[in-house]
Amino acid sequence: MISLTALDLLDELLNDSSSNMIWLYEVYMLYKTYTSYFFMSSKSFVRGVKRYLIYFCYCANFIALFRVIFGTIFVYSPDGITPFMTDFVRWILIYLKGSINSLLYMASFTKQISLLRGWRTEHAELS
């Protein structure tokens, strides 16, 4: 029989791996867009992508800091908290972390689409 702790660790590993893959894919797509010659012809688009990459790095650093802070809180939690309460708080934080990751991913995807739409309208006006 597999213990519940092992399943928790596997669940956490899969969740972290999937969110990290989403972040890496987003950075790769931004880099590919930024270095593409087709998009380099518009200076405002290049400025927007640079600014977006900076915001993206800030969000990734915030999430990493969030994980480190709550990881240390769980390691150094007082013994007075019951195991049920610790598990309950832990699951709430895992849910919040997943929600924040999903919201940031959707926001970054929406921002990328709006940048592309802005570039298309600007490019159409120039032609």
Curated annotation (Swiss-Prot):
What are the record keywords, sorted?
Cytoplasm, Membrane, Transmembrane, Transmembrane helix
Gene Ontology CC entries for this record: cytoplasm; membrane
Membrane-crossing segments per the record? 20-42, 54-76, 91-110
Give the signal sequence positions.
Answer: none
Is the keyword Cytoplasm assigned to this protein? Answer: yes
Q: Give the location in the cell.
A: Membrane; Cytoplasm
**Topology in the membrane?**
Multi-pass membrane protein
Protein name, as recorded: Uncharacterized membrane protein C18E5.14c
Organism per entry: Schizosaccharomyces pombe (strain 972 / ATCC 24843) (Fission yeast)
The root-end lineage is:
Eukaryota, Fungi, Dikarya, Ascomycota, Taphrinomycotina
